[in-house]
């Protein structure tokens, strides 16, 4: 039986790029955003360049820092509100 093994590197890189774009659009430096989400700047920087496999708790911190849901952070789709 062969198990499907996914190379997470492209996913990590894509997620990091999304974080970098959102942070830049929000006008934060890496240091400012890392402070906002209570994360070390160098650790956050390594997420942006795709060197970190982000834990669920850090995923929550990042989504909260951008004032969005995890789903919106991961897909780029925001929920409509009335």
Language model: regions and residue ranges:
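Residue-level signal for the short linker/turn that defines the boundary of a DNA-recognition helix
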Residues: 17, 27-28, 54-57
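Short, charged recognition helix plus adjacent turn
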Residues: 1-4, 64, 74-82
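Residues within the helices of the helix-turn-helix
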Residues: 20, 31, 60
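Short alpha-helical DNA-recognition segment
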Residues: 27-49
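A short, Lys/Arg-rich alpha-helix, primarily the initiator
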Residues: 2-24
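Alpha-helical residues within the helix-turn-helix
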Residues: 24, 35, 64
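DNA major-groove recognition helix of helix-turn-helix/homeodomain DNA-binding modules
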Residues: 57-72
